[in-house]
Amino acid sequence: MSLLQFQQVGYWYKNKSQPLFQDINISFQKGKFYTIVGTSGTGKTTFLSLAGGLDAPKEGNILYDGKAVSKIGLTNFRNQYVSIVFQAYNLLPYMTALQNVTTAMEITGSKEKNKESYALDMLQKVGINEKQARQKVLTLSGGQQQRVSITRAFCCDTDLIVADEPTGNLDEDTSKEIVRLFQDLAHKEDKCVIMVTHDEQIAKVSDINIRLSRGSFTVKENVAVV
């Protein structure tokens, strides 16, 4: 069964006669790494906002594990069922980087016994050392904050992870490591990962690439993922 399903989803900003999306039907499964690409104005971030419960469709339904997200409630859905990595970071500025991660783990019911140790290990994997992990996030650079946001998503006990350009502020080596971690989440942890990216190289190593154009989309399954 699909983890997330769009059923005849339509969305528009001001006028129904000029929809951004119309009659979108697509399913997302656990164990898969999806990328979404498209030119500016095709609705990539809006699509991801719908998938992550940050916005609701104007028409149609979005189902999570067979249940309508509208019935679950957007706030409850975001808090309990999805981990979100957006460019705005959405971190708690007066908490430390470590506290941001462990608090999210508590909220989503992580079963890790030593949450602090696990979070520190994951932060180090994305280039945040222990000293930085114990600093308030408002003292960290934009790129460092992005790494904390990514780590928070990695550590939360949710089956769905949505990410908007998560490697945008990172150097090439760190970007490759982040993509590898997203792949591992999908393939080794059986998560559903949906990532918006402008990087065609990342799109090539995803399992399924969704290319948006105005009002429509195409889906390509990548046979060999390196």
UniProtKB/Swiss-Prot annotation:
Residues 4-226 form the ABC transporter domain. ATP binds at G38, T39, S40, G41, T42, G43, K44, T45. Keywords: ATP-binding, Nucleotide-binding, Transport. One of its GO terms (biological process) is transmembrane transport. This is Uncharacterized ABC transporter ATP-binding protein YclH. PANTHER family: IMPORT ATP-BINDING PROTEIN (PTHR24220), LIPOPROTEIN-RELEASING SYSTEM ATP-BINDING PROTEIN LOLD (PTHR24220:SF689). One of its GO terms (cellular component) is plasma membrane. CDD domains: ABC_MJ0796_LolCDE_FtsE. InterPro entries: AAA+_ATPase (IPR003593), ABC_transporter-like_ATP-bd (IPR003439), ABC_transpr_LolD-like (IPR015854), MacB-like_ATP-bd (IPR017911), P-loop_NTPase (IPR027417). Transmembrane segments: none annotated. The keyword Cell division does not apply. Belongs to the ABC transporter superfamily. The keyword ATP-binding applies. GO terms for molecular function: ATP binding; ATP hydrolysis activity; transmembrane transporter activity. The lineage of its organism: Bacteria, Bacillati, Bacillota, Bacilli, Bacillales.
